[in-house]
Amino acid sequence: MNLLIIGSGAREHTFAWKIFNSKQNVSLFISNSNPGTTKIAKSVSIDINNFSDVKRSIIKNSIQIVLIGPEIPLINGIYDFIKNDSDISYVNVIGPSKYGAQLEGSKEFAKKFMYRNNIPTASYRSYDISSIDDAILFLKNNEPPFVLKADGPAAGKGVIIVDNVNDAIHNLKEMLIDSRFGDSSNKVVIEEFLTGIEMSCFVLFDGINYKILPYAKDYKRIGEGDKGLNTGGMGSVSPVNFLDIDLKDKIEKQIVIPTINGLIKEKIDYVGFIFIGLINVDGFPKVIEYNVRMGDPEAQVVFPRIENDFMEI
């Protein structure tokens, strides 16, 4: 079979490496390859955000499976584009629909999904430019620290934690008035600050069944000692040393299963990775965020721990 990987980073290199080592007969193609992938996959030049360009490559290379690495094509609806085009609708897409991708594309959408499905998470409020005065009043009437999140995608940099009201108001204005993160901060979610240790849970979902992959812990902050602004990821480790059987059981029963049931109940087209950002609060897991694709750098430490043939999972 011919399989196209969309993306050109270390995550996609990890996908290619794992699939290359499959016992199944897979011809690998990868968009805009990096030096590490040229030895194991054929590079195809694609503008991954131009879906007509993706279509041409699918047809030209007789692609049967498309595995999407980064979030932006998913948020922009690449799944829907492929499935709604009669020329290429036969292609299996590993990734959710545009509607499902809002779990990552909109913090407010994700929070509402969690609330509807009784999934433990921090309390929150959301505001846009029309309600900025209410947001400022909310900050003044509550105790810091505050967590401010751009509603839309911001490459892992749209979360700001502030320790005082003045800084919170300053950052809020930068996001809503000055468009600090472009359209992604047209709306801002203000969350309860949770104290605990963060970790990541990865689930592979086929629309009905799921498998939990190895857990990981990533380090987002740019400075030494886990300080400074968030990045897309400075590094990652797996296994997670504080993850015991009791915590695993709680994560599956209280978070993974309700997430899966919610996707099915709400008829959300979703086949692919569910990346659940968690925080362990005194032995009780809560969801910080959903991502609708595999993590990077997490893929680099998770996939080497998978002993199974990935094409058989």
What label would you give each PLM region?
Residues 296, 305-313:
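Conserved, structured core segments of small domains
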